[in-house]
Design a protein with these regions (language model features):
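His/Asp/Glu-rich metal-coordinating catalytic cores
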Residues: 3-162
């Protein structure tokens, strides 16, 4: 969650994620945006890890699972446009998931996302990052969404429930 990460730490993370017997998707955010000198671009990632690298939403098909995982990245520390703007998952009978960094009902510079955009997205589930507190499972329209929070607080201003969602 920052641009000043030791390469050894990133390599250890890549090895750990490579040991997970499942696909892993990463949507870089405002503190770790994707760029040519980011830890994401400068690291050899295992085949099971996909890092979203553009502000445009892209989809990755998971053959045999009837599922598409969509996502996008911050490529600069600020984004005043909703990453969901103009997105609609195709109504094709598949499960459509998305990983994004953004601020639900936010008005600021960190990917503001309106609840109406979530409801209109056609997604099955939207996995969000940015808010370091657990939101619990929420629903907008037919789309479930959640912030898991961070695994542990990074300061005394980040107390309360923490965790991950699997």
């Amino acid at each position: 969650d920052g641009g000043q990460t030791y390469q050894e730490t990133v390599q250890a993370l890549a090895r750990t994620l490579g040991g997970i017997p499942a696909p892993v998707f990463i949507a870089p955010g405002n503190h770790d945006c994707y760029g040519p000198r980011s830890v994401y671009a400068g690291t050899a990632w295992p085949d099971n890890v996909h890092i979203f690298s553009t502000v445009a939403v892209e989809g990755v098909e998971l053959p045999g699972l009837n599922c598409v995982v969509h996502g996008a990245a911050f490529t600069t520390p600020q984004a005043d446009r909703s990453p969901l703007m103009g997105f609609a998952a195709p109504r094709d009978g598949r499960i459509h998931l998305m990983a994004l960094h953004g601020d639900v009902e936010g008005k600021g510079r960190y990917g503001p996302i309106a609840l109406e955009d979530i409801a209109a997205s056609g997604l099955t589930y939207l996995a969000l990052g940015h808010i370091h507190a657990c939101s619990g499972l929420q629903k907008a329209g037919d789309t479930y969404w959640a912030y898991p929070g961070c695994p542990e607080g990074r300061g005394f201003d980040e107390l309360g429930d923490k965790g991950v969602l699997v």
